[in-house]
Amino acid sequence: VGVLVVNAATVPTRRDESWRYSDLEAVASVWPVPAAELIEVAAGEHVSRVVVQDAAIDAVAIRDFRVVLHKGATATFHVLNTGGKLGRVAIDVTCHEGSHFELGGAMLGGGDQTLEIVTTLNHIEPNATSNQVVRSVLSGRATGSYLGKVAVSRDAQKTDASQSVKAMLLTRTATANAKPELEIYADDVKCAHGATVGELDAMALFYLASRGIAPAEAKVLLLQAFVAGAFAEIADEAERATVEAAALAALERMLDMSLPQETRASPKTPLPLAGGAGGGPVL
């Protein structure tokens, strides 16, 4: 029997706010984690990143990013978090004057998975904006957590920051945690956040069934529509197709685990990820 020995002083605990919902035993098994990847965007430039976290189901996958946006710079992140016993993506962003950060993220998990998206937006100069859209679909005993802090300094007047967080629970044993947080020291800002947790709309399922669509396939279609808002802005068609295929595969796996073999759906072509952040008639 192996014994795991770690430096307890360095491993996160429940007292660490950004780790409060995490699988700390899994974290300890890979601690210390690599340093955050630094992405520095020069004034007026743009960076776009697509992160697909689909590690093996027994893996521990922790990815950290540190983003610095100089004057007028923009960055767009799209995150699909589906893999691992623990799958965690953390992004720390510093926004200088007139910069913009955009996040579209989704967590799709089942079984005993713990999935996390953790963000910190530091607005330190005026006229910067940020927008975050996160969607979760959870089944089994999975836990999906979004922790997003927006910190606005005294000099960051005219900040405009928003967070939209929605979760869909396919089983009553799944857990969704949402903790949008605002820390504002400026007096001329616009900051908004919203978080909801729900289930598939029975009326929407009934409507699709009345059109001859099998129940399992109907669920996949509705769930695809639900997560669509997180990825609608991916400009590169190849990247969008990659994320779309990975999301569809994750949704089908989740539903397959809870359905008899004869009722399982196998859509041949994923829906295009289009639509507004509301994600269709499912919440």
Residue ranges and their predicted role:
Residues 269-270:
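N-terminal cationic leader/targeting segments used for protein routing and processing
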Residues 4, 8, 12-14, 23-213, ...:
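Conserved beta-strand/loop scaffold segments within soluble protein domains that form the structured core
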Residues 17:
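Divalent metal-cofactor coordination and adjacent catalytic microenvironments
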Residues 1-4, 254-259, 263, 283:
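Intrinsic disorder at enzyme termini
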Residues 21, 50, 262-265:
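Positively charged, low-complexity intrinsically disordered regions
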